[in-house]
């Protein structure tokens, strides 16, 4: 199927019209209104060079917060209080860290300057959030994503020290459990996400869950939290996670 060509009008075709690879539409812009509409519709942008490509894969990996997998090694890392974790303290450093951090399975980045500007604006509007992992006074890992209703859309994460990105998502999961979030939308499946507990579900089921989640109140205020002792997160998750 040919991808839908977007114009100035804020509209997307239904995700079920995506091609077998998940490509749904081409063009448009990264304005806050269009991005929020996309995420609420089960669609996300992913491209290296213009035009902007919009996707809605036929299968969607979700992490349900209480089904997050905390491995024994991650539990031990959290217990050691090696890192300090904060939310929304330095969004720009985190998104640029995700854009520039070396990755074994990639030679480039899809996080362009245009994307950085667009998501930084969403952060200022209270929809995009960052998790920073600190070692001494340096950010050594983190993640960022979008929050709408009680759905969190994970965009990217990075790590410069052992388990730093896993520590970030652990603290995020604690926050999501405390605030009754439905899921983390991981967008595209990979082995790392599966190890963290992601379930791959059909798009049709995802859209049903999404519709309910985004109708809830959005926490658009700054997520101003500090985790000075990640050992407390380890204890919390051990008590709250459902064994698998």
Curated annotation (Swiss-Prot):
It catalyses: N-terminal L-lysyl-[protein] + L-leucyl-tRNA(Leu) = N-terminal L-leucyl-L-lysyl-[protein] + tRNA(Leu) + H(+); N-terminal L-arginyl-[protein] + L-leucyl-tRNA(Leu) = N-terminal L-leucyl-L-arginyl-[protein] + tRNA(Leu) + H(+); L-phenylalanyl-tRNA(Phe) + an N-terminal L-alpha-aminoacyl-[protein] = an N-terminal L-phenylalanyl-L-alpha-aminoacyl-[protein] + tRNA(Phe). Its EC number is 2.3.2.6. It is found in: Cytoplasm. Signal peptide: none annotated. It is an enzyme of class 2 (transferase). Keywords: Acyltransferase, Cytoplasm, Transferase. The keyword RNA-binding does not apply. GO terms for molecular function: leucyl-tRNA--protein transferase activity. InterPro entries: Acyl_CoA_acyltransferase, Leu/Phe-tRNA_Trfase, Leu/Phe-tRNA_Trfase_C, Leu/Phe-tRNA_Trfase_N. Pfam families: Leu_Phe_trans. GO terms for biological process: protein catabolic process. One of its GO terms (cellular component) is cytoplasm. Transmembrane segments: none annotated. The keyword Ribosomal protein does not apply. Functions in the N-end rule pathway of protein degradation where it conjugates Leu, Phe and, less efficiently, Met from aminoacyl-tRNAs to the N-termini of proteins containing an N-terminal arginine or lysine. NCBIfam families: aat. Belongs to the L/F-transferase family. This is Leucyl/phenylalanyl-tRNA--protein transferase. It comes from Thermodesulfovibrio yellowstonii (strain ATCC 51303 / DSM 11347 / YP87).
């Amino acid at each position: 199927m040919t991808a839908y060509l977007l114009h100035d009008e804020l509209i997307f075709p239904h995700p079920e019209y995506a091609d077998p690879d998940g490509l749904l539409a081409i063009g448009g812009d990264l304005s806050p209104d269009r991005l929020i509409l996309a995420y609420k519709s089960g669609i996300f942008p992913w491209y290296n060079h213009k035009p902007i490509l919009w996707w809605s894969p036929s299968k969607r990996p979700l992490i349900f917060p209480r089904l997050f997998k905390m491995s024994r090694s991650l539990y031990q890392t959290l217990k050691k209080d090696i890192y300090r974790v904060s939310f929304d303290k330095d969004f720009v450093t985190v998104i640029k860290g995700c854009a520039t951090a070396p990755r074994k399975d990639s030679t480039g980045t899809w996080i362009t300057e245009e994307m950085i500007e667009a998501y930084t604006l969403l952060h200022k509007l209270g929809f995009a959030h960052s998790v920073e992992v600190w070692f001494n006074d340096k950010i050594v890992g983190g993640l960022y994503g979008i929050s709408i209703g009680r759905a969190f859309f994970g965009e990217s994460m990075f790590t410069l020290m052992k388990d730093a990105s896993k520590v970030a998502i652990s603290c995020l999961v604690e926050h999501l459990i405390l605030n009754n979030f439905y899921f983390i939308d991981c967008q595209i499946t990979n082995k790392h996400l599966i190890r963290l507990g992601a379930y791959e579900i059909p798009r049709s089921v995802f859209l049903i869950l999404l519709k309910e989640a985004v109708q809830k109140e959005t926490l658009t205020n700054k997520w101003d939290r500090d985790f000075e002792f990640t050992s407390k997160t380890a204890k919390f998750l051990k008590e709250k996670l459902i064994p698998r």
